[in-house]
Amino acid sequence: MDHFSSEGGATDSPIGSARFTTTHWSVILEAARPEAPGGVDAFARLYRDYWYPLYAYLRRRGYSHHEAEDLNQSFFVSLLERDRLRDLERGGGRFRSFLLKALQNFLANEWDRATAAKRGRGQAIVPLDDVDAESRFLADPTQAAPETGFEREWAFAVIEHAMRALAAELRAAGKERLYDHLRPHLQGDRNGRPYAAIAADLGMSEGAVKVGVHRLRQRYGELLRAEVARTVGSEAEIAEELRRLIAIVSA
């Protein structure tokens, strides 16, 4: 599936400069400060959204399902420890690259299979469906190297987060049914239902459906760009990271 349609897709987003008031970097730094209101909750949301790429990376490194789960939890918990965040104040960089490098260092310097379970269990940041995660991993037909697989899973996680944000907006506006019908066309699915059939189901004209798809593609592009903006350190890096994501999911 092509997640980036050439018609009003992510690269054609009308958003100009993105706001950097709440990046993933700032979420980690705030979560490390006990006095920061909502910091830990924000970090939990970040973990929920981006834990799977790291889980899949660990599985590709040869760790078992339970080892990968425990190591993943423990790694994120370690990011909340103040003494591990001293070097995070920086002016640029991709959060994707930081997380992977930090996990690699975590595995090399502090953890082995024998100690994984001792600290990982019982420190769940948020409840996760680990059975679903393992099923998802086993269903992936690709035999990518761990680092390549991580970048691929990260790209799809960013895309899915933007799509969920769009769904939430439409649900709040009472347009969830419209979203359900138009979603395949937002992601460039060539096997999506014809506009005429969608129009008949929704009681709209075919022209109105086309306008709806165009507008939702624009909004999807905005939300995707905003999500990418939260994972980089400067506005100059947004376009480059978007291009990188497009290349990854198109490979």
Language-model segments: what does each one mean?
Residues M1-A251:
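Intrinsic, short, N-terminal disordered tails of RNA polymerase sigma-factor systems
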